[in-house]
């Protein structure tokens, strides 16, 4: 039984799952929209929306928190800057629901359900 289980394992061990979410989050922040499978998109939505909610209060601790969640490299540094300076102010009056998931197709090869995840208002 999976009662009260809070996240999807996505067929990966914990470090691999965290790396996947960091990379997907950086891609989404850089591009505004990405195509991925539905379970990955649903996990990514939780991950990114927490970052945006935290980023609304733009102080040094917020910068450090977001940077730690996105990894510690130049790509994460640019994504952190974009979240805090561009994306979070755009959603300042919204209390949640910063992303939308649009189901698109079934992937040829393994028939995985694909979707586009994007920020609302783009």
Swiss-Prot record:
It holds the Pfam family Ribosomal_L17. The lineage of its organism: Bacteria, Pseudomonadati, Campylobacterota, Epsilonproteobacteria, Nautiliales. Belongs to the bacterial ribosomal protein bL17 family. Keywords: Ribonucleoprotein, Ribosomal protein. PROSITE patterns: RIBOSOMAL_L17. InterPro entries: Ribosomal_bL17 (IPR000456), Ribosomal_bL17_CS (IPR047859), Ribosomal_bL17_sf (IPR036373). One of its GO terms (biological process) is translation. Part of the 50S ribosomal subunit. Contacts protein L32. This is Large ribosomal subunit protein bL17. One of its GO terms (cellular component) is cytosolic large ribosomal subunit. The keyword Ribonucleoprotein applies. One of its GO terms (molecular function) is structural constituent of ribosome. The keyword Ribonucleoprotein applies.
